[in-house]
Amino acid sequence: MTSPLTPSASEGRWTPRLWGTLLVLCAAMFLDALDVSMVGVALPSIGADLGLSTSSLQWVVSGYILGYGGLLLLGGRAADLLGRRQVFLVALGVFALASLLGGLVDSGPLLIASRFIKGLSAAFTAPAGLSIITTTFPQGPLRNRALSIYTTCAATGFSMGLVLSGLLTEASWRLTMLLPAPIALVALIAGLKLLPRSARERDHNGYDIPGAVLGTASMLLLVFTVVQAPEAGWTSARTLLSFLAIAVLLTVFVMVERRSPGPLIRLGVLRSGTQIRAQLGAMTFFGSYVGFQFLVTLYMQSLLGWSALHTALAFLPAGALVALSSTSVGSIVDRFGTQRLLAAGFALMVVGYALFLGIDLDPAYAAAILPSMLLIGAACALVFPSLNIQATDGVDDREQGMVSGLLNTSVQVGGAIFLAVVTAVVTAGAPADPTPQAVLDSYRPGLIVVTGIAVAGLLIALSGLRRTTGAQQTVVVARSDTRSVVKETATGTEAETERVPVRD
């Protein structure tokens, strides 16, 4: 299902141009993750230099999350309608300019604005980049390998961001903001030459402006509410009214999408059990990991007294394992299918989190911490590529951006919601007498929640494993004059359908 405007990969082999295309897209994914992790370590220096309060400092992080999570649905559909290459390159250019702005500003509000713009840009590069891969590389071993390399760049970027931030902040926090700019510029120049040209969707049924406004508004409000809830209070009038407004917006959004001839999100996509499992798996995978990283970072820095760089190096084995496995995961998917890898990955994740429950105040890294890091790294290497493959397999080229945006939205919303839940649990159990042991004990309920989220992901994966029982599935894409309907079948037939075999 490749576009006639994409470079030919029908022979099932890698070419220098395909490698160049993938490298550009990986650079953008790497930058997104790098930017998220680098700023966390630099926050104390930023606050001291710009005179920001703790609440204002939070928005240096939350501003990026708000722009990214709130606009992913729009970014994915824009890639389908306006051209994937065009959307990706314009957004990458904006990302580079916002990085430059963030490193040069001398006020908190401008820094927060630059972070929001970077998040907004990433909301367009992420789904556009993923959809370029799924429409350039033919479905099967070639695409699976490309996706496994692409998705592991996120873990690599995140791990390197932690280490680089610890080093750069020693000189100036501004370097952490400026570093992505030259990388983005080089990727932009290379992308102009290497990325395949894609035509705009000519036969779409107009632009879904009401759906875009409602979908973006509901996602922005959801992310904002979840980020603010721990400070405002989960049962406060403001939080409850915000959730009520979100429910109303989403209800109206669904009504609009059902009637729109060219919807922002075609709701029929969500009738596929495989698609539902991919979206829920993305939420539980990222939500559990973000909560784990938050608690472990607090443990290492607040209770063990480790520096930011020491903490980053403690997480490095997990990222290194993901990076080293990047070229082999695709072939494992070809052999065993995504559902088996998801079940195995979530099982490893559950064990890794559970092992950390027994941690104490005097741990031996090799015996107490490293095993969890390696198990979680192996889990990430299996789960994240499999989720991307599962979500995009069998989807029409015209809807790859939409599905990519939906998957990335699930990742971000899951991370925001579950991190807020873990934070609320830990805050509720904060000890009156904050001795180190009492504080450590207050972290354990949060770790139990993290483990429970991973167990939920494992159950979702196992439900798909029972359905497939090792057989090959067929995703049926049925078309009508105005919209498509995607659904899952094992033996049924459909009139006017296109069948795509998927190893689920």
Regions of interest found by a model, annotated:
Residues 1-17, 464-504:
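Intrinsic disorder in cytosolic terminal tails and internal cytosolic loops
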Residues 2-193, 327-329, 336, 347-350, ...:
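Transmembrane-helix bundle of Major Facilitator Superfamily
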Residues 18-34, 39-41, 54, 175, ...:
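12-transmembrane solute porter fold
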Residues 76, 105-107, 138, 169, ...:
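Short helix-capping/hinge motifs at transmembrane helix termini and TM-loop junctions
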Residues 132, 136, 194, 224, ...:
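A residue-level signal for alpha-helical anchor/packing sites in multi-pass solute transporters
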Residues 148, 169-282, 288, 306, ...:
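Hydrophobic transmembrane-helix bundles of small-molecule transporters
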Residues 152, 156-171, 224, 413-432:
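A gly/Pro-rich, aromatic-decorated transmembrane alpha-helix motif that marks the paired
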Residues 163, 186-193, 221-224, 252-255, ...:
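Transmembrane alpha-helix boundary/anchor motif
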